[in-house]
Amino acid sequence: MRSGQSSRTEPASLPWHPSGLVAGVDEAGRGPLAGPVMAAAVMLDERQPIMGLADSKKLTPARRASLFDEIRAKALCYSIAQASVQEIDALNILQATLLAMRRAVQGLRLRPALVLVDGNRLPRLDIPAQAIVKGDALQPAISAASILAKVQRDHWCVQVHAEFPQYGFAGHKGYGTAMHLAALRAHGACIHHRRSFAPVARSLPGACR
């Protein structure tokens, strides 16, 4: 696999690759104590521009939700994939994230000529790829991918909250807030918690606290 890394890329410099289409890839959910890590791959259509694309973390939930629908309606194609809690615990969070990214690219209906990935690590692909630090703020396709991954994971948290309301997943989205840590101490871990993460491991039966 040919690959490269860049810490700076002009936002409009790579909408199309000379030999074909470009896909942007990003993830959501590396830091939380529970749930899968999500990844999305997006190939934008320059004939249908989407205004306001940005790093998903800098957008309000309402704006993310609006863009989530617009991206899915206007993109040439997109794919959302995940790596499970079991895979995170077996592989570690970095390798599970790269696995989810690879699955997202493999799920695209069209084959890109170049894959732009947010961050400084690349998943194993059979397509030329470039890692771009802060790519979610620099490349519209990566911004779109970050929004799809974030909103999809937030949806998962809301659904799981109905099953396990005592943990408050709908509010903290799985992150290690004071409320979440208190719930872990009170109730122990549920099936969706990442047992390889230290705060969860400390809540398991027999763990030293």
Swiss-Prot record:
Gene Ontology biological process terms, A to Z: DNA replication, removal of RNA primer; mismatch repair
Main location: cytoplasm
Location of the RNase H type-2 domain: 20-209
Species this chain originates from: Verminephrobacter eiseniae (strain EF01-2)
Protein name: Ribonuclease HII
Catalytic activities: Endonucleolytic cleavage to 5'-phosphomonoester
Recorded GO CC terms: cytoplasm; ribonuclease H2 complex
Enzyme Commission code: 3.1.26.4
Swiss-Prot/TrEMBL cofactor(s): Mn(2+); Mg(2+)
Subcellular location: Cytoplasm
InterPro entries tied to this protein: RNase_HII, RNase_HII/HIII, RNase_HII/HIII_dom, RNaseH-like_sf, RNaseH_sf
Coiled coil: none
MF (Gene Ontology): manganese ion binding; RNA binding; RNA-DNA hybrid ribonuclease activity
Superkingdom of the organism of origin: Bacteria
Pfam families in alphabetical order: RNase_HII
Residues holding a divalent metal cation: D26, E27, D118
Cofactor note: Manganese or magnesium. Binds 1 divalent metal ion per monomer in the absence of substrate. May bind a second metal ion after substrate binding.
Positions of transmembrane segments: none
Similarity comment text for this entry: Belongs to the RNase HII family.
Function (record text): Endonuclease that specifically degrades the RNA of RNA-DNA hybrids.
NCBIfam families membership: PRK00015.1-3, PRK00015.1-4
